[in-house]
Amino acid sequence: MTVGFAMCGSFCTYSAVFPVMEELAASYDLLPIFSPAASTIHSRFGTAGAHIQRATDICGVTPLRTIQEVEPIGPKKLLDALIIAPCAGNTLAKLAHGIADTSVTMAAKSHLRNGRPVIIAVSTNDGLAAAAENIGRLLVRKNHYFVPFGQDDAIGKPTSLVADFSRLPMTLEAALEGRQIQPLLLG
């Protein structure tokens, strides 16, 4: 079974995301996909090159990084499921509004044409603000499944939401059966 693993630019979560990628690589063939931000931005959490290399080492293939590289995902039915982890607020907005102008959003659009699941692991500082509407739109869409999420710092960042990445494998399994894992909201 082949699973796409798309990464957006919520760099602070990479230390939690890469171990889950490693766990999934033991059971699935993973096709890594990097957003433009993930592909190019160096941050205090590491360089773009280091992140690309780590994904390559885990998955055994270099991440796809362009619209042209990901567009065949749908027509060639390359994936059984697509994970977006972390899924930043900008990508949430684009998915909610049907905008496919990055490698990750085009991968989702192309993959969804086959009626197969997209698993979203949200990570955004405005999840209970501007991004809340976009999360709501995606929650009711067919073939969209969310990794359970909650506030990561209710006092310091009261609108921030982040997925519990350790629940990504069980969310993927449920999504492949057409089910949303519960509970979705973590307290």
Region spans (language model):
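A cross-family phosphate/adenosyl-ligand binding-site feature
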Residues: 1-118, 123-187
